[in-house]
Amino acid sequence: MTENIKKIIEEKLTIIKLPNKKKLIEEEIIEGISYKDGHIQISLFANKDNIEEIEFVGKLIKKELQNIEGVISVTTVLTNEPNKRETNDRTEDKKQKIQQINNVKKIIAIASGKGGVGKSTISINLASAFSLIGKNVGILDADIHGPSIPHMLGLKGKPEVNSDKKIIPFEFNSMKVMSIGFLLNDEQPVVWRGPMVHSAIKQMATETDWGELDILIIDMPPGTGDAQITVSQHLPLDGTIIVSTPQPVALNDAVKAIGMFRKVDIPIIGIIENMSYLLLEDGKKEDIFGKDGAKNMSEKEKILFIEEIPLDKEIRESSDRGVPYIFEKKDGLTKDIFLKAAKKINKII
């Protein structure tokens, strides 16, 4: 960062005042400033209680800095540095405590070891299938860094809080829905470390007014990181469903996910193989990503093979329109498979 640009940015930031009339520069919100080739990035400290305030601050910063000569773009990112702040107030109890969610009978995590296997698609359509067989269903989007559930359900806006200070979830066809995506702008990146991810997931799970639910589906992010540890150690999971494609590269990561859940004593309900085959117009199946990969792996790992979901263009199109395929399609092979999977899982849990 050139010294001249740095000085101009700092001077501009000293001008900004918050709604409480205090100067932004005095509130210890700014974590870092970077500038390169006309692009400014401001890192802002965020916690679970000030997300909306920080979002507003980001808008003020962009408005103030975007007119600086030579500046092409201004980006604000949310970050969290637990070692720098509130260390005396953040001494955590080492004992892992399960947070009960009132009035929710069963909680199922939909997980995968690898991204891009269609886990969120499976989550919304499986939840929809449960709804169609008469269950009261909720969906919690636990993918903090890449929430896609709001888009796939066509939901926008910010959630409100009721008189009990509980978050009022959004609804789609009577399904209750909560996601970090409702709290941030679409273009707002989230740069959070473990403690912040942990806090956000727990808050959404336990401080949302879910009402009476038969099943809460938790759409997990890919991998075996902070979000998975938080959900498995702090929420009363009844089991997890692993999603994978038939490809060896996806199956290898699925095995890692299975191993993680077993280590924390979470039952594996079974595995769903997504994009199993492409159904051609003449009725033939084309095994684009291989054949029977998840089925063979389920036998090796001694877990239930739930169903295989075909690669169906209509599923993708429905998600892009913001309507689950299960609700939009009146009948068809893929819909029958999802309903069959829901009934099979319902018997197990």
Locate the predicted segments by residue.
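N-proximal, solvent-exposed amphipathic alpha-helical segments enriched in charged/polar residues
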Residues: M1-E31
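Residue-level signature of catalytic and energy-coupling elements of molecular machines
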Residues: L13, I30, L65, V104, ...
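Extreme N-terminal, non-catalytic leader segments
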Residues: E26-I29, K36, A46-N50, I54-A111
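Conserved catalytic-core segment of NTP-binding enzymes
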Residues: I54, G58-K59, D214-I215, P221-S318
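Walker A/P-loop phosphate-binding motif and the immediately C-terminal alpha-helix
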Residues: K106-I144, I258
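Phosphate-binding loop that captures ATP/GTP phosphates
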Residues: F130-W192, H198, A205
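Phosphate-binding/switch loop-helix module in NTP-utilizing enzymes
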Residues: L184-V231
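C-terminal boundary of histidine-terminating zinc-finger modules
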Residues: R321-G332
